[in-house]
């Protein structure tokens, strides 16, 4: 599995740096 950023996302953007939104969770690049 991908490392989770600990952030949820709803519009394709994550506030955490170097994180990508895979709805509804942000994952580290």
Curated annotation (Swiss-Prot):
Probably participates in a plant defense mechanism. This is a cyclic peptide. The keyword tRNA processing does not apply. The lineage of its organism: Eukaryota, Viridiplantae, Streptophyta, Embryophyta, Tracheophyta. The presence of a 'disulfide through disulfide knot' structurally defines this protein as a knottin. There is a cross-link at residues 1-29 (Cyclopeptide (Gly-Asn)). Belongs to the cyclotide family. Disulfide bonds join 5-19, 9-21, 14-26. It comes from Melicytus dentatus. Pfam families: Cyclotide (PF03784). Keywords: Disulfide bond, Plant defense. This is Cyclotide mden-F. One of its GO terms (biological process) is defense response. It comes from the Eukaryota.
């Amino acid at each position: 599995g991908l490392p989770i950023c600990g952030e949820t996302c709803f519009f394709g953007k994550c506030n955490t740096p170097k994180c990508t939104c895979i709805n509804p969770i942000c994952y580290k690049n």
